[in-house]
C-alpha cells in the first residue's frame, strides 16, 4: 500500500510539472525564430508517445510484455519453445533450443491467504475445509433422540466445507450451501468405509452441521471485514498519500 501511495504521488507531481513546463514553453516557428512550424517533424526532444503503433509499454505493437508481437512468453512470434517462429529445434540466435520453459512461481500471498482462511480442498470447486470444532450439545425434544445423539455424535462431522463469504449475498445462502456440501462429503466418505446412516442420523447431522456453518460464517465474515478495514486504513494513513492530499489541498486553497 505504501508503494502505491509513492507511485500516485510521483505520477501527480510529474503531471503537474509537465503541465507547468508546457505553459511556460515558447511557441516554436515563426519568422526568423529558428524553430519548425511543424513540431512533430524533426523535433530534437524525440517523440514522447509509443513508437511504431504500439500502446504504452508495447514498443513493437505487441501486448504487454510482448516485445515483438508474440503472445506472452513468445519473444519473436513463435509458439512456446520456438524462439524465432520456427518448429522445434529450428530457432536461430543464441537461444538454447532444448531449454524447457521455467516453472511458474508460487504466489506466496495467495498461499498465505488460503492458509489463513482454511485448507482448499482439491476436486471440490474452491471449497475450503474449516478448523475442527466441538460438536454442540443439542436437545431434539425427546429423551430417546437426545440419548441417541450423545451416543453417536462422534460419527458426525466436526469440520465444515465452505466457500469464501464474499461469494454469497447473505448468511442463509452460505449456511445452506455449507450444510449440503458438508453432509454430502461426510456421507460419501463414511459410506465407503462400510458404515451407513439412518434417517435419524441425517436429521441430527443437519442440526449439528447447521450450527457449525453459522459459527463458520460469523468467523469468516469478521475476518473479511477486518481485512478490508485494515487495507483501507493502511492506504489512507501512509505518508505518501497524506502528503499528496495535503498538496492537493494546498493547490485548491492557494
UniProtKB/Swiss-Prot annotation:
**Gene3D superfamilies membership:** Prion/Doppel protein, beta-ribbon domain (1.10.790.10)
Q: What is the effect of changing residue 104 to L?
A: No effect on interaction with GRB2
Question: What ranges does the record give for the region Interaction with GRB2, ERI3 and SYN1, renumbered to this chain?
Answer: 23-231
Q: What is its main location?
A: membrane
Question: Lipidated positions for GPI-anchor amidated serine?
Answer: 230
Q: How is it modified after translation?
A: N-glycosylated.
Where along the chain is Cu(2+) 2 bound?
68-70
Locate the Hydroxyproline modifications and list their residues.
44
The protein's recorded glycosylation sites are 180, 196
Where, by tissue, is this protein expressed?
Highly expressed in the brain, lung, kidney and heart. Expressed at low levels in the liver and spleen.
Q: Where is the signal peptide?
A: 1-22
Keywords noted in UniProt? Amyloid, Cell membrane, Copper, Disulfide bond, Glycoprotein, Golgi apparatus, GPI-anchor, Hydroxylation, Lipoprotein, Membrane, Metal-binding, Prion, Repeat, Signal, Zinc
Q: Which GO terms describe its biological process?
A: cellular response to amyloid-beta; cellular response to copper ion; cellular response to xenobiotic stimulus; intracellular copper ion homeostasis; intracellular signal transduction; learning or memory; negative regulation of activated T cell proliferation; negative regulation of amyloid precursor protein catabolic process
Outcome of residue 108 to F?
Linked to long incubation time
Disulfide bond among keywords: yes
Kindly list the positions annotated as binding Cu(2+) 1: 60-62
Q: Where is this region: Disordered?
A: 25-104
Protein's membrane topology: Lipid-anchor; GPI-anchor
Q: Where does Cu(2+) 4 bind?
A: 84-86
Cysteine pairs bridged by disulfides in the record: 178-213
**Localization terms from the record:** Cell membrane; Golgi apparatus
Q: Which residues form the propeptide?
A: 231-254
Q: Which disease is it linked to?
A: Found in high quantity in the brain of humans and animals infected with degenerative neurological diseases such as kuru, Creutzfeldt-Jakob disease (CJD), Gerstmann-Straussler syndrome (GSS), scrapie, bovine spongiform encephalopathy (BSE), transmissible mink encephalopathy (TME), etc.
Q: What does this protein do?
A: Its primary physiological function is unclear. May play a role in neuronal development and synaptic plasticity. May be required for neuronal myelin sheath maintenance. May promote myelin homeostasis through acting as an agonist for ADGRG6 receptor. May play a role in iron uptake and iron homeostasis. Soluble oligomers are toxic to cultured neuroblastoma cells and induce apoptosis (in vitro). Association with GPC1 (via its heparan sulfate chains) targets PRNP to lipid rafts. Also provides Cu(2+) or Zn(2+) for the ascorbate-mediated GPC1 deaminase degradation of its heparan sulfate side chains.
What name appears for this protein in its UniProt entry?
Major prion protein
- Organism encoding this protein: Mus musculus (Mouse)
Q: What is the lineage of its organism?
A: Eukaryota, Metazoa, Chordata, Craniata, Vertebrata
Q: Which gene encodes it?
A: Prnp
